[in-house]
Amino acid sequence: HHSKHHATYVKGANDALEKLEEARAKDDQSTVLLNEKNLAFNLAGHVNHTIWWKNLSPNGGDKPTGELAAAIDDAFGSFDKFRAQFHAAATTVQGSGWAALGWDNLGEKLLIFQVYDHQSNFPLGVVPLLLLDMWEHA
């Protein structure tokens, strides 16, 4: 997964940056827009996978403690309710995407949401903490 899918997003982002520079030099606005879209997709794929790798642990799977446990209880009522909502978000992604847990800096609480494909449709002000890859290859 790391050497195939993740590496493809890194290469795609680098390629899009090169093509974007060329298109800007030629003042080719339609190609600029196309490559900005390609850059956003591939860069988001890279960032999402980078967070996902950090979430994986050979000894993981236990309930959180401390501030995270308190924030989960505050936002969802209990760890079991959090897990049920996160599971629902993950298993109902239409097509390809991600389930996400993020910290809302404005509301100062945890939120669960879906990310479609790799498009970083995180709500503004939300920092992703936990991502679960729900693409068919995952």
Curated annotation (Swiss-Prot):
<keyword id="KW-0479">Metal-binding</keyword>
<protein>
    <recommendedName>
        <fullName>Superoxide dismutase [Mn]</fullName>
        <ecNumber>1.15.1.1</ecNumber>
    </recommendedName>
</protein>
<feature type="binding site">
    <location>
        <position position="49"/>
    </location>
    <ligand>
        <name>Mn(2+)</name>
    </ligand>
</feature>
<dbReference type="Pfam" id="PF02777">
    <property type="entry name" value="Sod_Fe_C"/>
</dbReference>
<dbReference type="GO" id="GO:0046872">
    <property type="term" value="F:metal ion binding"/>
</dbReference>
<keyword id="KW-0560">Oxidoreductase</keyword>
<feature type="binding site">
    <location>
        <position position="133"/>
    </location>
    <ligand>
        <name>Mn(2+)</name>
    </ligand>
</feature>
<feature type="binding site">
    <location>
        <position position="137"/>
    </location>
    <ligand>
        <name>Mn(2+)</name>
    </ligand>
</feature>
<dbReference type="InterPro" id="IPR036314">
    <property type="entry name" value="SOD_C_sf"/>
</dbReference>
<feature type="binding site">
    <location>
        <position position="1"/>
    </location>
    <ligand>
        <name>Mn(2+)</name>
    </ligand>
</feature>
<dbReference type="InterPro" id="IPR036324">
    <property type="entry name" value="Mn/Fe_SOD_N_sf"/>
</dbReference>
<comment type="similarity">
    <text>Belongs to the iron/manganese superoxide dismutase family.</text>
</comment>
<dbReference type="GO" id="GO:0004784">
    <property type="term" value="F:superoxide dismutase activity"/>
</dbReference>
<dbReference type="InterPro" id="IPR050265">
    <property type="entry name" value="Fe/Mn_Superoxide_Dismutase"/>
</dbReference>
<keyword id="KW-0464">Manganese</keyword>
<dbReference type="InterPro" id="IPR019831">
    <property type="entry name" value="Mn/Fe_SOD_N"/>
</dbReference>
<dbReference type="InterPro" id="IPR019832">
    <property type="entry name" value="Mn/Fe_SOD_C"/>
</dbReference>
<dbReference type="Pfam" id="PF00081">
    <property type="entry name" value="Sod_Fe_N"/>
</dbReference>
<dbReference type="InterPro" id="IPR001189">
    <property type="entry name" value="Mn/Fe_SOD"/>
</dbReference>
<comment type="function">
    <text>Destroys superoxide anion radicals which are normally produced within the cells and which are toxic to biological systems.</text>
</comment>
